[in-house]
Amino acid sequence: MGGAVEEKDGAGSSGRLESLAGNTAVPDMRLELVPIPVSDVDRAKAFYQQAGFGNLHDTQVTATMRVVQLTPPGSSCAIVFGTGMGPITDMTPGSVKGIHLVVADMAATRAALTARGIELSDVDDMGGVLYSYFSDLDGNLWALQQWPAGYQP
């Protein structure tokens, strides 16, 4: 296996990795939906709406299949939970840990979430990168992350 070289196209899209051996580049793939295992769909829906997630889609597909999608503010990636969705809903509630929500202003985000009744950890400063954590009612753990000023990830 050859090494990898990251090439950015001029359109500002994510980089494509190509092998030095000349393998075909893999087209862009967007992360659009992350499953969150919950024990009670309505309770989870209320929590995430309380946390400011929007763009709600709540569909009873069949008598046993319900799909709920919500999107964090400013994100193009949504979360999904529900019933009857096979391996997605077979995951253990509370087993997802460390999904990162990148924020521009940790203090403002914490203040807004606290005002909405969301409990957050104290802020951890890890070399200029700030973190604060919250969990949903099942224990799925979310990380708020703020990059240092001027950092371009």
Identify what each model region corresponds to.
Residues 2-33, 54-137, 141-153:
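Vicinal oxygen chelate
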